[in-house]
Swiss-Prot record:
Reported function: E3 ubiquitin-protein ligase which accepts ubiquitin from an E2 ubiquitin-conjugating enzyme in the form of a thioester and then directly transfers the ubiquitin to targeted substrates.
Domain of life of the native organism: Eukaryota
Claim: Transferase is one of the keywords in the record: yes
The protein's Enzyme Commission number: 2.3.2.-, 2.3.2.26
InterPro entries in the record: ARM-like (IPR011989), ARM-type_fold (IPR016024), HECT_dom (IPR000569), Hect_E3_ubiquitin_ligase (IPR035983), HECTD1/TRIP12-like (IPR045322)
Phosphothreonine modifications at: T87
Keyword annotations from UniProtKB, A to Z: Isopeptide bond, Phosphoprotein, Transferase, Ubl conjugation, Ubl conjugation pathway
Pfam families cross-referenced by the UniProt entry: HECT
GO MF entry, a single one: proteasome regulatory particle binding
Protein known as: Ubiquitin fusion degradation protein 4
Gene: UFD4
Principal EC category: transferase
Active site annotation, chain numbering: C1450 (glycyl thioester intermediate)
Homology family: Belongs to the UPL family. K-HECT subfamily.
Source organism: Saccharomyces cerevisiae (strain ATCC 204508 / S288c)
Length: 1483
């Protein structure tokens, strides 16, 4: 732009280093005292060849030693040992365990605010002496003389401050006296109140208690507010009210005094008529503060409607306060407050129906929740809730913007309404759209617009599934035989009355599939119990026509439930009451179906093999061993057979405050008391056994199994099995296999039905076809081609059969950590007691008697490496303390000191081997992981794991020298991510009877079949549930099946679940902990767990570089910091921008540089086609999909190979730090990388047809030529006419064989030529590049972990994903704030403009907005923070049209002026994205 208009262009805005926006949301920073981020800050000068260009500057300065220590303490687990207990050697009974605090860091020994203990003092004493030893030569003073005063200074207390001056006290007293004389001199009283308010705000609670007589002041204020003479002194009253509010804030004790002075009715009177809006708003603010502690008193005063009667005339701030008063009061409702609620509800209902402000809606939901919880038992309760109010509550559950907590409360409200009133229950069924409410509430968790319900449910929180399932349960009348539920139905018969049969049938037909999917996809016990109860109640109400429609779904579910009898036994051999409860529930459902619809369901029951399962269950139930005397009666959690809502105190709302010693903490809001709804029966094992046997006998007698006959279809299947197992059946050609597939298809699919999963496996059909496929000698290409031709129109149906069989057969178990409270994220901070016993001669090995038998409280996720460090540290400390005693009484010689130092140095290098259960443990294993895996392997009860003290033996390591050299080598390379699954990469798992089904699914997937039907809902739910066990994951104790299935059969799981699995198992300990802390952000147990807050801290490393040498500098960064566990952040010299925006731009620019032609890394064909993707098409860059160029063996290729190594590190680094790349890789590139990383798989496929298909994706014209040669391989004349030699097509410098340039192609050597070209394009020609990429990638984390992601997905992740810029998507994922709303015309124009952008403009816009030209996976929905547009105000007399938009890249914030027309807006936007790129400057 010209200079005189330069003020119009606002470049990318930036932030100071301590701005919240510059922080990556995936990690957490440490701050020093001044608020600066603690971390590395390296500077890159503008010299490309300087070998020492990395230096530390500024407040981030840290040398190499500090760097290593930083890495160690942040990524590794040093300091995870909490307690140290000393015991007498050999004494195991009646010992006194004296706990000794172990510091978190060996380098940090300063005492904090904790009480000082003698061991701490001695340790500091010893370390100070050791430091002084090194500098004490030639000094006369003894080290003790210098160290002792320091210790004493630490113990000494501080001098207390002097008391407040008497003059100030007198002044305060005079001001308070003035307020008491307000009727005589209102002005003096008002000024006195102003000064008092200001003084109070500068005091703390202790000062207020000491110098202000609160009773007097509050009494005077109450008198001012109630004095009729002062009624017109509105400014005085506002100042009085504000002074009282400030007093409440500083000294919460004063609230109770004010309530005793009857301040509430006085303030309420000020709202009857509003003549001064400022006074009204101050009154509302004051009463709201009182309501947080004394809501009950406000409720007693009555007339709640006064607070909201002028709601529409108040500012949004005052509206929130008014609703908060009502909400806080409703949290303390009792049954005798019914009239008060009746009075206020007519005013609240329209507000509730029309409110859009989320804080107001949250308060209103809390109010309704409190009303339901307290008044549900009142006679006229149902009159409080009209149909429009109920529909509004249903709507809140449905809409996406409602927070989860509010949705759960709304569902609880609906549940209480349905339970309390038959009329409301019927209205909910017939006049509201329950199905739409459920499905829309689930859609918010969908990862893609087209995801099926089974995919979405995997990500729905259990709490929401529980609430919806429970609500459906209470909608219907109880089942006749209540086995799982404990309700004693007290309502009249109206609940079972169906006034609209058509509506009811439609509801049931839609609900049952949803319930079946919830059961299949949820692994939570309570969710499944609710679903079973709901199904029992729904089935009890349906007729034959409805039952026919849901026949197959119910029977498949029952078959899946009853087939899980293997999981009913715990690891220690006892019977699981939870699994037994579900089995009994499944049998009860089957019994009900048999009673009502035996003829209708019999064929399906038979086809699914239900009878065989029931027979087996009879034996299992009879074999239940009641080791303890169980009560055969049902144990209920409440009164026998009574379903009711009970109110329990909510932890957040009823804390007790210690007025004497601590400042009272007033909550920001008061949550209503929790509604506890009891529906479940708790079944004893004795009841499960007796009831199970009873149900089995009833089912078998009803169906008369003896009359079951072998059907004609089974005869046909047996015939097909015999054909498949006959060795003479031809399978050598494509036609042979078409015949086999045709026979199989005809056997499986019939006009009226398809073979069930049970029939497919039980008849041996699955096994025989699997054997035939795996033993076939024909190429995979022929197998796949023939299968697709035959099964083309019914692949999804075949997949459904296979998935049904897998769901029924799999019996993989979820393991938990054995905690009584269920674990969760707080389990990461748990400690476990271990007893360390030295296995050897302690005195001979200088171990020390105290360490020969030691009890240690250690973090579960601590590794044995940290345990080794702990022992070395203790040995050195004890040795040093022992050496002090003679040194204090006699002067030591230089030789003595040198000998002692050598001894200590030897101890510091000592290493130990550890043994648990007589087995040597891996040093990288976690303590909990080793103990946990042993418990599982030995079938021990996991709950005892937390009660026992576990003995771990240790001895002097025989590999000490080797380990020292390895440690030194690792130190030189820099700290790396801790990999706790490294030695379990390809653990083999016995998949049992499901092996054949898994093999068939794998075959179908390898045929290139694209279908969501590959995802198995049940296994996906199990894996998601397993990943919800943080302690198991972080300890490296995930079950083998989870590792095996995700690597070997990744198609069984949705992308997001696999991505989460990758993050949990491969991204290092620090990021793993941070991932769960982010997921659990806001939970109360997380906030209160200080130990957990200290876990998983990740260091940020800030690197400042020059734009002129960005690529060369980037390579050096990758070389030095590529494997670092720190988060890397980039800044540019002479630019103010920091944080996410410049970092994303760095990754984008380096991505582009890697695609330069001059690097000679990629295939570059002059005849190459252009991709549909729109990219920068300058001559300097590769425009086709990136695929390695074959290397010329006679050229120097070291630079190219080195670049591929850097590329691998760069790509892995982007995954680790969650950065967006801008590559356009060929899918074949990752296919070959995957094959190279998979054991027992060749990099290049063995059949030519498959190879040609891969080449076609790389170079379509070359593939076409090769296919032509293959088609004419016997036509010598045609081949010779091509005049081809044995060189790589397009590159005559690379010969396929020695002397290939002189050898011509003919019919006798055509196969040699084809294989030679394939080998150069896909094999030997690019092998070194592929290996270099894998090695570079694996410097960050092992590339083998990437096998759980498909090549197509990796291509999308690294830049080729299609982006949705539709207007609907933009409206959904854009926020308008600070001057704009989503209804603003400017926002409509803006969305219309950017949705019409071309691909080049989109890239520019994203580069301008975020720093990267690409959106993350998931599109605009995945932008974090959310894309936000705010108003940019014109200043200095300029108009909005003279300004350009500006951005805050770290916050995805666009500041948009209010342009006068759409055309001007488009022009200014295009100008900004074109000219505003390339720098991050202050606007």
């Amino acid at each position: 732009m010209s200079e005189n208009n330069s003020h119009n262009l606002d470049e990318h805005e930036s932030h100071s280093e301590n701005s919240d926006y510059m922080m990556d949301t995936q990690v957490e920073d440490d701050y020093d005292e001044d608020g600066h981020v603690q971390g590395e800050y390296s500077y890159y000068p503008d010299e490309d060849e300087d070998e020492h260009m990395l230096s530390s500057v500024g407040s981030f300065e840290a040398d190499d030693g500090e760097d290593d220590d930083n890495d160690y303490h942040h990524e590794d687990d040093s300091g995870l040992l909490y307690g140290y207990h000393r015991t007498q050697n050999g004494s195991d009974e009646d010992r006194n365990e004296e706990e000794d605090g172990l510091e978190r860091s060996h380098d940090n020994n300063e005492f904090g605010s904790n009480p000082l203990h003698l061991p701490d003092i001695l340790e500091t004493f010893a370390q100070r002496l050791e430091q002084r030893r090194q500098t004490s030569e030639g000094l006369g003073q003894h080290p003790v003389g210098r160290t002792l005063p320091e210790i004493l200074s630490m113990i000494g207390g501080r001098m207390e401050r002097s008391a407040e001056s008497s003059a100030r006290n007198e002044r305060i007293s005079k001001l308070i006296e003035n307020t008491g004389n307000a009727s005589e001199d209102p002005y003096i009283a008002m000024e006195s109140l102003k000064e008092l308010s200001e003084n109070i705000l500068m005091m703390n609670q202790m000062v207020v208690d000491r110098i202000i007589p609160m009773e007097t002041l509050i009494g005077n204020i109450a008198a001012i507010l109630s004095d009729k003479i002062l009624r017109e002194e509105l400014e005085l009253q506002m100042q009085a009210c504000r002074c009282m509010y400030n007093l409440f804030e500083v000294c919460p004790e004063s609230i109770s005094i004010a309530v005793d002075e009857h301040v509430i009715p006085i303030l309420q009177g000020k709202l009857v008529e509003i003549s001064y809006i400022d006074l009204a708003e101050q009154v509302l603010e004051t009463v709201e503060y009182i309501s947080r502690v004394h809501g009950r008193d406000i409720l007693k005063t009555g007339q709640l409607s006064i607070y909201v009667q002028f709601f529409d005339f108040l500012t949004i701030h005052a509206q929130r306060k008014a609703i908060a008063i009502v909400s806080n009061a409703c949290s303390s409702i009792r049954t005798d407050d019914f009239k008060t609620i009746v009075e206020v509800l007519p005013t609240l209902k329209p507000i509730f129906s029309n409110a859009t402000d989320q804080p107001i809606l949250t308060r209103l939901v809390n109010a309704m929740y409190g009303i339901c919880g307290a008044l549900h038992g009142v006679d006229k309760f149902e009159t409080l809730f009209s149909l429009d109010l109920i529909e509004r509550i249903v709507q809140l559950v449905s809409i996406q913007d409602t927070p989860l907590e509010n949705k759960l409360k709304c569902l609880d409200i609906l549940t209480v309404l349905a339970m309390s009133s038959d009329v409301l229950s019927r209205e909910l069924r017939e006049k509201t759209d329950i199905v739409d409410m459920a499905t829309r509430s689930f859609q918010h968790y969908s990862k893609s617009p087209n995801a099926g319900l089974h995919e979405t449910l995997i990500y729905v929180p259990n709490s929401l599934l529980i609430s919806i399932s429970r609500f459906i349960v209470v909608l219907f009348p109880p089942e006749d035989e209540r086995i799982l539920s404990a309700d004693k139905y007290t309502g009249n018969s109206d609940r079972g009355v169906i006034s609209n049969q058509e509506k009811f049938d439609s509801l049931v037909q839609c609900l049952i599939p949803i319930l079946v999917e919830i059961y299949t996809n949820a692994a939570d016990f309570d969710v499944r119990r609710y679903v079973l109860i709901a199904l029992l109640r729904v089935v009890s109400c349906i007729n034959n026509s409805t039952a026919k429609a849901i026949n197959d779904q119910l029977i498949k579910l029952i078959g899946s439930i009853l087939a899980q009898k293997e999981t009913a036994s715990n690891a220690n051999g006892t019977y699981s009451s939870e699994a037994g409860t579900l089995l009994v529930g499944g049998l009860s459902l089957l019994d009900l179906i048999c009673k009502k619809f035996s003829e209708l369901f019999f064929p399906s029951i038979k086809r699914e093999g239900i009878f065989d399962l029931v027979k087996d269950l009879s034996v299992d139930f009879n074999n239940i061993d009641l080791k303890e005397d169980g009560n055969e009666n049902i144990s209920l959690s409440d009164e026998e057979g009574d379903l009711h809502s009970s109110i329990e105190e909510c932890d957040e709302g009823d804390e007790e405050y210690d007025y004497e010693f601590t400042d009272m903490e007033i909550p920001d809001s008061v949550k209503p008391k929790k509604i506890s709804i009891h529906i479940f029966r708790t079944l004893s094992l004795a009841y499960i056994k007796n009831k199970g046997v009873n149900l089995v006998n009833r089912v078998l007698s009803q169906m008369n199994v003896e009359q079951e006959a072998i059907t004609e279809e089974l005869h046909q299947i047996e015939g097909v099995v015999s054909i498949l197992e006959n060795p003479s059946t031809p399978d050598k050609t494509e036609e042979d296999w078409k015949g086999i597939w045709s026979v199989l298809k005809k056997c499986i699919f019939h006009e009226d039905f398809d073979v069930s999963g049970f029939e497919f496996t039980s008849t041996g059909l699955a096994s025989s076809i699997t054997k035939r496929i795996t033993s076939s000698t024909v190429s995979h290409f022929i197998l796949a081609k023939s299968f697709l031709e035959v099964f083309e129109d019914c692949i999804d149906r075949f997949l459904e059969i296979l998935q049904s069989a897998l769901t029924r057969l799999e019996n993989f178990s979820i393991v938990d950590c054995g905690l009584h409270d269920g674990g969760g994220v707080s389990s990461l901070a748990k400690e476990i007691k271990i007893k360390l016993v030295y296995d050897g001669d302690a005195s001979k090995d200088n171990i020390g008697t105290d360490l020969s038998s030691t009890i240690v409280s250690v973090h579960c996720i601590a590794s044995f490496t940290s345990l080794n460090e702990f022992l070395r540290h203790r040995m050195v400390r004890m040795r040093f303390l022992n050496s002090l005693i003679p040194n204090l009484t006699s002067s030591s010689t230089e030789a003595d000191r040198e000998e002692e130092e050598n001894c200590l140095d030897h101890m510091r290098k000592k290493n130990f081997d550890f043994f648990y259960d007589n087995e040597k443990v891996d040093m990288e294993s976690t303590v909990f992981g080793v103990i946990f895996n042993t418990f599982v392997r030995r079938n021990r009860d996991l709950k005892t794991l937390w009660d026992d003290t576990h003995t771990i033996k240790f001895c002097k390591s025989l590999e000490g020298n080797n380990r020292e050299s390895e440690a030194a080598e690792e130190a030189n390379e820099g700290k790396k991510l801790r990999d706790f699954y490294k030695k379990r990469e390809f653990a083999q798992v016995d998949t049992g009877s499901s092996a054949d089904i898994l093999t068939l699914l794998d075959f179908l997937h390898s045929c290139g079949v694209k279908s969501d039907s590959f995802i198995n809902s049940k296994l996906s739910a199990k894996l998601a549930r397993q990943l919800d066990e943080p302690l198991v994951v972080a300890s490296g104790a995930l079950p083998d099946w989870s590792l095996f299935l995700t690597r070997r059969f990744p198609f069984l799981f949705p992308f997001d679940t696999r991505m989460l699995f990758l993050q949990c198992t491969s991204f290092g300990y620090g990021r793993l902990i941070q991932l769960w802390k982010n997921k659990s952000k806001g939970s109360k147990d997380l906030r209160n767990d200080e130990a957990l807050q200290q876990l998983g801290r990740i260091t940020r490393r800030k690197l400042r570089i020059s734009r002129k040498t960005i690529f060369a500098t980037g390579l050096k960064i990758l070389s030095k910091y590529g494997s670092s566990p720190d988060v890397l952040e980039i800044e540019y010299q002479e630019e103010a921008g920091t944080g996410l925006g410049p970092t994303l731009e760095f990754y984008s620019v380096v991505s582009k540089y890697f695609a330069r032609k001059s690097l000679n890394m990629w295939r570059c064909n002059s005849y190459s086609y252009r991709s549909e993707m729109d990219v920068d098409t300058t001559d300097d860059y590769i425009t086709t999909l990136l695929f390695p160029e074959p290397l010329n063996p006679f050229s120097n290729n070291e630079k190219v190979i080195e670049l591929f190594g850097y590329l691998g590190t760069f790509v892995a680094r982007s995954l680790l730090d969650n950065r967006i790349l801008d590559f356009r890789f060929s899918k074949v590139f990752f296919e070959l990388l995957h094959r190279m990383s998979t054991p027992n798989v060749t990099t290049v496929p063995s059949d030519v047809e498959t190879c040609l298909l891969m080449i076609e994706l790389v170079d379509p014209l070359l593939a076409k030529s090769l296919k032509y040669i293959v088609a004419n391989k016997d036509d010598n004349m045609t081949l010779e006419s091509l005049s081809l030699t044995f060189t790589v097509p397009g590159n005559d410098d690379i010969e396929l064989i020695p002397g290939g340039c002189n050898k011509s192609l003919n019919s006798s050597n055509v196969e040699e030529y084809i294989h030679g070209v394939i080998d150069q394009i896909l094999g030997k020609g690019i092998e070194k590049q592929l290996k270099a990429f894998i090695e570079g990638f694996s410097k960050v984390f092992s590339y083998e972990r990437m096998l759980i992601l498909f090549p197509d997905e990796l291509v999308d992740i690294f830049g080729r994903v299609e982006e949705d810029w539709s207007m609907a998507t933009l409206y959904t994922n854009l926020n308008a704030e600070h001057g704009y709303t989503m209804d603003s015309s400017i926002i409509h124009d803006f969305i219309s403009i950017i949705s019409a952008f071309g691909k080049h403009e989109r890239r520019l816009f994203l580069q301008f907005l975020t720093g990267s030209p690409k959106l993350p996976i998931g599109g605009f929905k995945s932008l974090n923070p959310k894309f936000t547009v705010v108003l940019k105000h014109a200043e200095d007399g300029l108009t909005a049209d003279e300004y350009l938009p500006s951005v805050m890249t770290c916050a995805n914030y666009l500041k948009l002026p209010k342009y006068t027309s759409k055309d001007i807006m488009r022009s200014r936007l295009c100008q900004a994205i074109e000219e505003g790129a390339g720098a991050f400057l202050l606007s």
